[in-house]
Curated annotation (Swiss-Prot):
Main localization, broad class: cytoplasm
Reaction(s) catalysed by this chain's protein: L-lysyl-[protein] + 3 S-adenosyl-L-methionine = N(6),N(6),N(6)-trimethyl-L-lysyl-[protein] + 3 S-adenosyl-L-homocysteine + 3 H(+)
Enzyme class: transferase
Family matches, as InterPro entries: Ribosomal_L11_MeTrfase_PrmA (IPR050078), Ribosomal_PrmA_MeTrfase (IPR004498), SAM-dependent_MTases_sf (IPR029063)
Name of the gene this protein is made from: prmA
Family, per entry: Belongs to the methyltransferase superfamily. PrmA family.
GO cellular component, one term: cytosol
Known role: Methylates ribosomal protein L11.
Subcellular location field: Cytoplasm
Protein's UniProt name: Ribosomal protein L11 methyltransferase
Enzyme nomenclature, EC number: 2.1.1.-
Domain of life (superkingdom): Bacteria
Upper taxonomic lineage: Bacteria, Pseudomonadati, Pseudomonadota, Betaproteobacteria, Burkholderiales
Length: 307
């Protein structure tokens, strides 16, 4: 297969993309034309903040062509349909897309993840052979396995913040604790908590797809928990509240999350960069004294006990 690649201005990118799809290309993506250079301009921001850059000045439009398609003809047709300058048709290029078994290639990028010698995250395609270099085969087979495949919801165990929260649960979770996982994503933390001995476990997310993902993953792992949207969260306090989201939402949610922690209970927060730790901890200061429990690759896990 081949891709048609063309640089254009910000104002042209959307119209050209739509016209290319109408002309029959299989897919279109828009990238920063300066990607990988000093002029690259990241477009992102945490929830509650506006990205510093709203759009790239120079865009690279990449269109996947169907077999046998004439790229020049498709491009000219799209430019005309979008009412753009015909001169835009100059300067395009083609690049080959190698044939590949994309399912197998994707699976090869996700192997078993050891959180500790005891706790492992295992994709379904490694279900019968969770071998990882550095540990004896019998140690791997005796570990607690959480079966989880990458999907729409965040949380596969590979990100430092997920790893930090899992490590806390593995090391510190009180037996039988009532636990709230707020911002559950894939449900990985709630599922791990149940397998590690938590009692009643409630998983909450604002995204219905994440809630369904948690339900599905809990069924695969044969654990019982409740998964729901925030409005359905039952009343009451929890011995453990864990939230692996981002610093701005954590600050906004501080009164609610702190209020859900029972006296003597634990609050575990991640999704926080080292430079954000003091600010997030300060947001919880009226209710708990937070401290850094552990750091990993520039991210921290904050922990506090409610008096």
């Amino acid at each position: 297969m081949r891709e048609l690649v063309l640089n254009c201005r910000e104002a042209q990118a959307d119209a050209l993309s739509d016209a290319l799809l109408e002309a029959g290309v299989l897919s279109v993506s828009v990238e920063d034309a300066d990607l990988g250079t000093e002029a690259e301009r990241p477009l992102f921001g945490e929830p509650g903040t506006e990205p510093q850059v709203q759009a790239w000045e120079r865009n690279c439009v990449v269109a996947l062509l169907p077999g046998g398609a004439d790229p020049a003809q498709i491009l000219e047709q799209a430019i005309a349909a979008a009412g753009l300058d015909p001169a835009l048709a100059h300067g395009w290029s083609l690049r080959e897309v190698p044939d590949a078994d994309w399912v197998r290639l994707t699976q090869s990028q996700f192997g078993p993840i050891p959180i500790s010698e005891r706790l492992w995250i295992v994709p379904s395609w490694h279900r019968d052979d969770p071998a990882v270099p550095g540990l004896a085969p019998d140690a791997a087979r005796d570990a607690i396995h959480i079966e989880l495949d990458p999907g729409l919801a965040f949380g596969t165990g590979s990100h430092p913040t997920t790893h930090l929260c899992l490590a806390w649960l593995e090391a510190e979770l009180p037996a039988g604790a009532r636990l709230l996982d707020y911002g559950c994503g894939s449900g990985i933390l709630a599922i791990a908590a149940r397998k590690l001995g938590a009692g009643e476990t409630v998983a909450v997310d604002i995204d219905p797809q994440a809630v369904q993902s948690t339900v599905d993953n809990a069924e695969v792992n044969q654990v019982r928990l409740q998964a729901m949207l925030p409005d359905a969260l039952p009343a009451g306090e929890f011995q453990v509240v864990v939230a692996n989201i981002l610093s701005n939402p954590l600050k906004v949610l501080a009164p609610m999350l702190a209020g859900r922690v029972a006296p003597g209970g634990h609050l575990v927060l991640s999704g926080v960069l080292e430079r954000q730790a003091d600010e997030v901890a300060a947001a919880y200061a009226p209710w708990l004294t937070m401290s850094v429990w552990r750091e990993r690759d520039g991210w921290v896990c904050l922990h506090g006990v409610k008096a």
